[in-house]
From Swiss-Prot:
Protein name: Spermidine export protein MdtJ
Species this chain originates from: Salmonella arizonae (strain ATCC BAA-731 / CDC346-86 / RSK2980)
Membrane topology (UniProt): Multi-pass membrane protein
Gene Ontology BP terms: glycine betaine transport
Cellular component terms (Gene Ontology): plasma membrane
Name of the gene encoding the protein in the UniProt record: mdtJ
Entry-linked PANTHER family: SMR FAMILY PROTON-DEPENDENT DRUG EFFLUX TRANSPORTER SUGE (PTHR30561), SPERMIDINE EXPORT PROTEIN MDTJ (PTHR30561:SF2)
Its job: Catalyzes the excretion of spermidine.
Bilayer-crossing regions: 1-21, 31-51, 54-74, 81-101
Cross-referenced InterPro entries: Small_drug/metabolite_transptr, Small_multidrug_res, Spermidine_export_MdtJ
Subunit-structure text: Forms a complex with MdtI.
Length: 120
Protein backbone atom coordinates (compact mmCIF):
# COMPACT_ATOMS: atom_id res chain seq x y z
CA UNK A 1 0.00 0.00 0.00
CA UNK A 2 2.88 2.36 0.80
CA UNK A 3 4.20 2.13 -2.76
CA UNK A 4 0.78 2.94 -4.21
CA UNK A 5 0.74 6.07 -2.01
CA UNK A 6 4.15 7.00 -3.41
CA UNK A 7 2.76 6.54 -6.92
CA UNK A 8 -0.19 8.79 -6.06
CA UNK A 9 2.21 11.43 -4.75
CA UNK A 10 4.23 11.15 -7.96
CA UNK A 11 1.06 11.71 -9.99
CA UNK A 12 0.03 14.75 -7.93
CA UNK A 13 3.53 16.21 -8.22
CA UNK A 14 3.54 15.65 -11.99
CA UNK A 15 0.16 17.34 -12.41
CA UNK A 16 1.24 20.29 -10.27
CA UNK A 17 4.56 20.63 -12.07
CA UNK A 18 3.05 20.52 -15.54
CA UNK A 19 0.28 22.97 -14.68
CA UNK A 20 2.82 25.35 -13.14
CA UNK A 21 4.72 25.29 -16.44
CA UNK A 22 1.60 26.59 -18.20
CA UNK A 23 1.00 29.07 -15.36
CA UNK A 24 4.53 30.43 -15.78
CA UNK A 25 4.16 30.71 -19.54
CA UNK A 26 1.06 32.90 -19.31
CA UNK A 27 2.89 35.58 -17.41
CA UNK A 28 3.64 34.57 -13.85
CA UNK A 29 7.39 34.56 -14.24
CA UNK A 30 10.05 32.57 -12.51
CA UNK A 31 7.93 31.36 -9.59
CA UNK A 32 6.03 29.04 -11.93
CA UNK A 33 9.22 27.66 -13.43
CA UNK A 34 10.76 27.08 -10.00
CA UNK A 35 7.60 25.30 -8.84
CA UNK A 36 7.66 23.25 -12.05
CA UNK A 37 11.27 22.22 -11.48
CA UNK A 38 10.66 21.22 -7.86
CA UNK A 39 7.43 19.31 -8.54
CA UNK A 40 8.68 17.43 -11.60
CA UNK A 41 11.81 16.45 -9.65
CA UNK A 42 9.68 15.23 -6.73
CA UNK A 43 7.46 13.37 -9.17
CA UNK A 44 10.37 11.36 -10.56
CA UNK A 45 11.74 10.71 -7.08
CA UNK A 46 8.38 9.38 -5.85
CA UNK A 47 7.98 7.34 -9.03
CA UNK A 48 11.45 5.82 -8.63
CA UNK A 49 10.55 4.62 -5.12
CA UNK A 50 7.13 3.37 -6.23
CA UNK A 51 8.61 1.09 -8.89
CA UNK A 52 10.47 -0.86 -6.22
CA UNK A 53 7.26 -2.84 -5.62
CA UNK A 54 4.99 -1.85 -8.52
CA UNK A 55 5.79 -3.14 -12.00
CA UNK A 56 7.49 -0.40 -14.01
CA UNK A 57 5.09 -0.64 -16.96
CA UNK A 58 2.06 -0.44 -14.70
CA UNK A 59 3.43 2.42 -12.58
CA UNK A 60 4.52 4.44 -15.60
CA UNK A 61 1.25 3.90 -17.46
CA UNK A 62 -0.80 4.97 -14.44
CA UNK A 63 1.51 7.91 -13.69
CA UNK A 64 1.35 9.21 -17.24
CA UNK A 65 -2.27 8.29 -17.96
CA UNK A 66 -3.82 9.73 -14.81
CA UNK A 67 -1.52 12.74 -15.14
CA UNK A 68 -2.70 13.45 -18.69
CA UNK A 69 -6.32 13.05 -17.65
CA UNK A 70 -6.13 15.56 -14.79
CA UNK A 71 -3.83 17.97 -16.63
CA UNK A 72 -6.37 18.14 -19.45
CA UNK A 73 -9.28 18.72 -17.06
CA UNK A 74 -7.43 21.41 -15.10
CA UNK A 75 -6.22 23.05 -18.32
CA UNK A 76 -9.83 23.46 -19.40
CA UNK A 77 -10.89 24.77 -15.99
CA UNK A 78 -7.91 27.02 -15.23
CA UNK A 79 -6.58 28.12 -18.60
CA UNK A 80 -9.74 28.07 -20.75
CA UNK A 81 -8.35 25.49 -23.13
CA UNK A 82 -10.80 23.91 -25.55
CA UNK A 83 -11.97 20.34 -25.01
CA UNK A 84 -12.86 19.02 -28.46
CA UNK A 85 -14.81 15.87 -29.24
CA UNK A 86 -11.59 14.11 -30.23
CA UNK A 87 -9.98 15.02 -26.91
CA UNK A 88 -13.00 13.66 -25.05
CA UNK A 89 -12.83 10.39 -27.01
CA UNK A 90 -9.11 10.20 -26.29
CA UNK A 91 -9.66 10.78 -22.57
CA UNK A 92 -12.39 8.13 -22.45
CA UNK A 93 -10.05 5.68 -24.18
CA UNK A 94 -7.36 6.60 -21.67
CA UNK A 95 -9.73 5.91 -18.76
CA UNK A 96 -10.57 2.48 -20.19
CA UNK A 97 -6.85 1.76 -20.56
CA UNK A 98 -6.12 2.82 -16.98
CA UNK A 99 -8.89 0.57 -15.66
CA UNK A 100 -7.61 -2.38 -17.71
CA UNK A 101 -4.02 -1.85 -16.59
CA UNK A 102 -5.00 -1.52 -12.94
CA UNK A 103 -7.25 -4.58 -13.06
CA UNK A 104 -4.35 -6.57 -14.49
CA UNK A 105 -2.20 -5.85 -11.43
CA UNK A 106 -4.18 -7.85 -8.91
CA UNK A 107 -2.05 -10.19 -6.88
CA UNK A 108 -2.57 -13.84 -7.73
CA UNK A 109 -4.10 -15.98 -5.03
CA UNK A 110 -1.86 -17.89 -2.69
CA UNK A 111 -0.70 -21.16 -4.21
CA UNK A 112 -2.47 -24.19 -2.86
CA UNK A 113 -0.11 -26.55 -1.10
CA UNK A 114 -0.14 -30.06 -2.37
CA UNK A 115 -1.33 -32.55 0.17
CA UNK A 116 1.51 -34.68 1.36
CA UNK A 117 1.06 -38.30 0.55
CA UNK A 118 1.65 -40.90 3.18
CA UNK A 119 4.25 -43.38 2.13
CA UNK A 120 3.36 -47.02 2.42
Amino acid sequence: MFYWILLALAIVAEITGTLSMKWASVGNGNAGYILMLVMITLSYIFLSFAVKKIALGVAYALWEGIGILFITVFSVLLFDEVLSTMKIVGLLTLIVGIVLIKSGTRKPGKPVKEATRATI
